[in-house]
A protein has these predicted regions:
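A well-structured
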Residues: 1-159, 163-210
């Protein structure tokens, strides 16, 4: 079953890392880099920094928690005008041309998370503690550095991302505020609300046309 395979994936990853390590430490490394490129070996280096066999039990627990989280999201059954919809199907109504419909849809969507807040909080707390424990096992201060290795961020680090965040705040946020104000005027509203976030035109947003076959 998928769940069994997912829980076993850290053990499979252990085999992949062992194979990658043999390539990384190969006496033919220079030749291999010439053939498949240095980026592949940089990624191997990151994968070696982000994994150790002793982490397998913690990684299996992490997989179980993320699966539980996804299952909780998938369990949503929202009553909407005689239908039972999941979170994805509610998106259509959350972007309805009618503002009152949007508001009601957003409230229904939000209520699912409010009603399950305790379970979401519990899963989040367990995941944070699990990932922090993994980072500590590898000698890192917290999960940030380990997370970058696992995402294979091979050309930038957390300090560069902080610089980018600062630039977004300085340059993009003021620009975005102007765009949102233009959108508010176009929609004829005194003030934008959270349920207006996905609306751009009074006559509705552009929608796909045609059939899947086309």
């Amino acid at each position: 079953p998928y769940t069994t395979l997912f829980r076993s994936s850290p053990e499979l990853q252990n085999l992949i890392v062992a194979y990658s390590k043999s390539l990384y430490e190969s006496p033919y490394r220079a030749y291999l880099e010439e053939k498949i490129g240095p980026v592949a070996f940089k990624n191997i280096e990151l994968s070696l920094k982000g994994f150790d066999e002793k982490l397998i039990p913690l990684m299996q627990e992490e997989n179980a928690l993320t699966t539980e989280y996804k299952n909780l999201l998938a369990s949503a059954k929202i009553e909407w005008e005689g239908e039972i919809l999941n979170l994805s199907l509610m998106k259509k109504h959350m972007n309805s041309q009618d503002r009152d419909t949007r508001k009601r849809a957003w409230e229904k969507h939000t209520n699912f998370f409010v009603e399950n807040a305790e379970k979401f909080d519990e899963l989040y707390d367990k995941l944070v503690k699990n990932r922090t424990a993994q980072a500590k096992e590898l000698g890192y201060e917290n999960y940030i550095e380990l997370g970058y290795y696992r995402m294979q961020r091979n050309c930038y680090d957390k300090d560069m991302v902080k610089c980018f965040r600062d630039q977004v705040k300085k340059y993009l946020v003021p620009f975005a505020e102007k765009l949102h104000d233009r959108r508010r005027q176009r929609l004829g509203l005194d003030k934008l609300a959270y349920y207006d976030a996905g609306m751009f035109f009074n006559n509705g947003n552009p929608a796909p046309i045609g059939t899947p076959e086309e």
